[in-house]
């Protein structure tokens, strides 16, 4: 992927997408696929995982990826915000059903998969536990990801239960 500087992105009249650099993070990969599906060109700005990303924070108010920045609009970081922006700006087939009941289902599943405390959040938390077990206390304290996501070793059982419960519910929904 070709990345541009923050300065170049600030000068654009189109969409800028801040995405993980060097690691195929699931949220960034999903955001890129979403905007590509809707045929929306974007400039990519790199976000360096597990670092403070102070330049991004100063520009957007966020240090994580993905971040969608469209001129004269606030930065968007949540999955449903990205989906709504892509639907509004893009071309091609909509990912949203025309009927309200279907849209409610889609937005609910998006939130349950990619939203705060959703399946992806829980899975990341479980990965953090393995990662944390290989780090010193000082290294963990220096890594902004652990504090940003409220990592707490005692929450592992609850996160595992939430992830398993989601997968059970998803299996039931697919069978229905």
Annotated model-derived regions:
Residues 148-176:
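A mid-sequence, solvent-exposed acidic-amphipathic segment
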């Amino acid at each position: 992927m070709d990345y541009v500087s923050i300065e170049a992105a600030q000068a654009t009249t189109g969409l800028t997408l801040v995405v993980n650099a060097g690691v195929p993070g699931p949220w960034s990969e999903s955001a890129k696929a979403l905007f590509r599906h809707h045929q929306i060109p974007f400039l990519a700005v790199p976000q360096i995982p597990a670092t403070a990303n102070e330049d991004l924070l100063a520009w957007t108010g966020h240090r994580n990826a993905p971040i969608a920045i469209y001129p004269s609009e606030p930065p968007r970081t949540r999955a449903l915000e990205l989906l709504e922006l892509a639907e509004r700006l893009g071309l091609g087939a909509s990912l949203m059903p025309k009927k309200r009941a279907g849209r409610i289902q889609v937005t609910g599943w998006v939130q349950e998969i990619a939203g705060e405390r959703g399946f992806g959040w829980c899975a990341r938390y479980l990965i953090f536990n393995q990662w944390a077990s290989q780090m010193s206390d000082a290294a963990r304290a220096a890594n902004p990801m652990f504090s940003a996501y409220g990592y707490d070793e005692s929450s592992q059982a609850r996160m595992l239960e939430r992830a398993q419960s989601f997968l059970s519910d998803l299996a039931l929904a697919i069978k229905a």
